[in-house]
Amino acid sequence: MKISCFLLLILSLYFFQINQAIGPDTKKCVQRKNACHYFECPWLYYSVGTCYKGKGKCCQKRY
């Protein structure tokens, strides 16, 4: 019983969190094959815009 309740809790949290922060900026970033990060971009990436309704950064690989 405990395991089934735990799994139900995990599944409900997972499905309720999907697409909560997705806005037009996140969609545009992902369509351009870039990566969204909440904090600074990783070392080999640079910031090209925002994600998560302005709370994150859209990062593109340096070539």
From Swiss-Prot:
Residues 1-21 form the signal peptide. SUPFAM superfamilies: Defensin-like. Keywords: Antibiotic, Antimicrobial, Defensin, Disulfide bond, Secreted, Signal. Only expressed in epididymis (caput, corpus and cauda). The keyword Secreted applies. GO terms for biological process: defense response to bacterium. One of its GO terms (cellular component) is extracellular region. Gene3D superfamilies: Antimicrobial Peptide, Beta-defensin 2, Chain A. InterPro entries: Defensin_beta-like. The keyword Transcription regulation does not apply. It is found in: Secreted. Disulfide bonds join 29-58, 36-51, 41-59. Synthetic Defb38 kills both Gram-negative (E.coli and P.aeruginosa) and Gram-positive (E.faecium) bacteria. Belongs to the beta-defensin family. This is Beta-defensin 38. It comes from Mus musculus (Mouse).
